[in-house]
UniProtKB/Swiss-Prot annotation:
Its cofactor is Mg(2+); Zn(2+). The gene is rpoC1. This is DNA-directed RNA polymerase subunit gamma. SUPFAM superfamilies: beta and beta-prime subunits of DNA dependent RNA-polymerase. Its EC number is 2.7.7.6. One of its GO terms (cellular component) is DNA-directed RNA polymerase complex.
């Protein structure tokens, strides 16, 4: 590959998909060999020879067209080894090169009659129907040989351009034209099938039609205007891309490289093959039969039937089941066409190009991790040892625990305490990325500090769930390990979950408690009517600090919803604040005791607060203590 080729491959502005012209389709498959021979046309439906198990010449796996099936070896075996590179064998005509060319070299099938492309005919919307301004039902009648279409009305007064005629109607008109007393000089001309469709599309002058439509749009309203706009959009797209409407009718169809539709020998001697080979074989068989019928000047009705069958075979190859009966193989299973391979979730784009499997990644079910901090996630040890294996191996060798990679891998398989200790050191400060599909906004992938956990599930902090739109009913998440230092820094600085509190779309908090957290908070702070409020000063239910309450609760001396008196010198929001206390007592030491509904405040002579006891539940103490403890640590 030259430097200029390298440049064009690696530096481009955009990729454009447009309709291919018949010549371009031929150019894809046609090649001139070093000896000047032009190859590329697939003319035989055979795949491989059942005796020699070698590809048949001019067939769907032909080595002359697609390249050798073995590296640096021609079909007949005359030339072997790399020293014969570029030579074309005089005996079999195969170029001596690498077998991997069979992954990108294409062929083509030259059709004996034009066929319509099913995507443009039966797609939604039907571009053929829109361009010709003919209902889709009528276009189908023409393409599948049910009706004639008038291509040139001639001198006939009753015929109009693009008018549909049944077989009987056309026979009557023919009798009228060829009658002895006929006055028609310019005979009308009709067509049927994809050839007629191609003629109609060739007759379109896009620029002129576009001008006429623009004039018509200014004077029209409602549904008619919408229809005209839809038509002009299609025409403008054709003009802008320099595509011709008649290219929607195929004169040749490309044959994709054989290694993308392989034929594999199974253990029992049988062969497994791609469905595409069966679909291509149907097309070639029908195409060859049609060519033979045309050569021997077979009756028109037989030729027409063969053309219709060729159209149906090409339809099945491009999009099986889009129109007519679905072509099935063994076990009554529908054959996978080119469209089936490309489209959908399991198609080439979404499965293989957009959704590639990447190294240093894993996937598992998520469960709630209530003891985690917001920037942490629980990573199963089994997954961590696999993801961080190169780092662990490096550290094991550096610490002289093992001498080589093989010994390190053996030690890792045992997963003993020594390995786990090294793994713990490796993941310390090494952020990982968690992604939940579908990633609809940038918070769908965030960074976390991993914490080693048992089991096989990833533990996630419940507060980050709204950002991922995740819940714990079986959702799965992917783990990715940033390798480069720049990637790790970026993950820590920009993507860490604790740095993404606000939604980038609205600016509102996206870290909000929901579901379990809300229910838990409610249950923790709920007041149960069946619990009696204790008298102030009761030793069993009066505590000197929040810590004492927590200890008593953990010791199972208190239940969660039990009323208690607890000393608390912090600020208290009380509904009674605007009113005066229920009762005020002057004590012997000149201090003053204010008795409120849910608290007792004691002040000295200078009105300074000495102590405050509040009446609350154990659950509310747990809630407050947890929040105060968390805030004080940050």
């Amino acid at each position: 590959m030259t430097n200029s080729n390298l440049r064009t491959e690696n530096h481009f502005d955009y990729v454009k998909i447009s309709i291919a012209s018949p010549q371009r389709i031929m150019d894809w498959g046609q090649r001139t060999l070093p000896n000047g021979q032009v190859v590329g046309e697939v003319t035989k439906p055979e795949t491989i020879n059942y005796r020699t198990l070698k590809p048949e010449m001019d067939g769907l796996f032909c080595e002359k067209i697609f390249g050798p099936s073995k590296d640096w070896e021609c079909h007949c075996g005359k030339y072997k080894r790399v020293r014969h590179r570029g030579i074309v064998c005089e005996r079999c005509g195969v170029e001596v090169t690498e077998s991997r060319v069979r992954r990108h070299r294409m062929g083509y099938i030259k059709l004996a009659a034009p066929v319509s492309h099913v995507w443009y005919l039966k797609g939604i919307p039907s571009y053929v129907a829109i361009l010709l301004d003919i209902p889709l039902r009528d276009v189908e009648q023409i393409v599948y040989f049910n009706c004639y279409v008038v291509l040139d009305p001639g001198d006939h007064k009753e015929l109009k351009y693009k008018q549909l005629l049944t077989e009987d109607e056309w026979l009557e008109i023919e009798d009228e034209i060829y009658a002895e007393d006929s006055t028609i000089e310019n005979e009308p001309f009709v067509g049927i099938g994809a050839e007629a469709l191609k003629q109609l599309l060739e007759d379109l002058d896009l620029n002129q039609v576009a001008e006429e439509l623009r004039e018509e749009i200014t004077n029209s309203k409602g549904q008619k205007r919408a229809k005209l706009i839809k038509r002009i959009r299609v025409i403008d797209n054709f003009i802008a891309t320099n595509a011709k409407p008649e290219w929607m009718v195929l004169d040749a169809i490309p044959v994709i490289p054989p290694d993308l539709r392989p034929m594999v020998q199974l253990d029992g001697g049988r062969f497994a093959t791609s469905d595409l080979n069966d679909l291509y074989r149907r097309v070639i068989n029908r195409n060859n039969r049609l060519a033979r019928l045309q050569e021997i000047l077979a009756p028109e009705i037989i030729v027409r039937n063969e053309k219709r069958m060729l159209q149906e075979a090409v339809d099945a190859l491009i999009d099986n089941g889009r129109r007519g009966r679905t072509v099935v193989g063994a076990n009554n299973r529908a054959l996978k066409s080119l469209s089936d391979i490309i489209e959908g979730k399991q198609g080439r784009f979404r499965q293989n190009l957009l959704g590639k499997r990447v190294d240093y990644s894993g996937r598992s079910v998520i469960v709630v991790g209530p003891k985690l901090k917001m920037h942490q996630c629980g990573l199963p040890k089994e997954m961590a040892i696999e993801l961080f294996q190169p780092f662990v191996i490096h550290r094991l060798i550096r610490q002289n625990i093992v001498n080589n990679i093989k010994a390190a891998k053996k030690l890792i398989q045992k997963a003993d305490d020594e390995v786990m200790q090294v793994l713990q050191e490796v993941i310390e400060g090494h952020p990982i990325l968690l992604n939940r599909a579908p990633t609809l906004h940038r918070l769908g992938i965030q960074a976390f500090e991993p914490k080693l956990v048992g089991g096989r599930a990833i533990q996630l902090h419940p507060l980050v769930c709204p950002a991922f739109n995740a819940d714990f009913d079986g959702d799965q998440m992917a783990v990715h390990v940033p390798l480069a230092l720049e990637a790790q820094t970026e993950a820590r600085m920009l993507m860490l979950a604790s740095n993404n509190i606000l939604s980038p779309a609205t600016g509102e908090p996206i870290v909000t408690p929901s579901q379990d957290m809300v229910l838990g908070s409610y249950y923790l702070t709920a007041l149960q009517p069946n619990y009696q409020k204790p008298e102030f000063g009761d030793n069993k239910t009066t505590f000197a600090s929040l810590e004492d309450v927590i200890f008593a609760f953990e010791d199972k001396r208190l239940s969660l919803h039990e009323w208690i008196w607890v000393r608390f010198n912090g600020e208290v929001e009380d509904e009674d604040e605007m009113r005066s206390p229920q009762k005020t007592q002057l004590l012997e030491d000149s201090s003053r005791l204010e008795i409120w509904n849910l608290r007792r405040d004691r002040f000295d002579s200078d009105n300074n607060l000495i102590s405050r006891f509040i009446l609350t539940t154990v659950g509310r103490v747990v809630m407050n203590y947890t929040i105060i403890d968390s805030v004080s640590k940050t």
